């Protein structure tokens, strides 16, 4: 198991996902990978709308097509990638300061093959996206050999 890439950023902008876009670009460049190579993702879904907009910001689909990604089932088991198999922050209570660690543990379990009923089959790559207060974003790309 290794961290293959890391992206981060911060902004004072009250709206938008530009920082997530920039952090994802940095992440993919460092990892030498692209969004199409992500098998499982835990992203910061503090609202349903955030999740949809982050599909686009992280490059999982073109801008304006997150709805189609969901309708086609490409964000869940049997699709192109599985997003938030833990249920996401909304189901985990969005615990401040603990949610990033919970995401990391979830993704490592999938890469180790120890996620039980939530297991993403043959997961070898994973992406973590975390947003903090005041527009801070951290992205991490995990992989196993």
Per-range role (PLM):
Residues 6-12, 39-48:
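A short beta-alpha structural unit
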Residues 17-31, 106-112:
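Short, well-ordered amphipathic alpha-helical segments that serve as non-catalytic structural scaffolds
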Residues 34-37, 63:
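Short acidic capping loops at alpha-helix termini that bridge into adjacent secondary structure
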Residues 42-89:
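Active-site pocket-lining segment
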Residues 47-56, 84-145:
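Conserved beta-strand-centric core segments of catalytic alpha/beta enzyme folds
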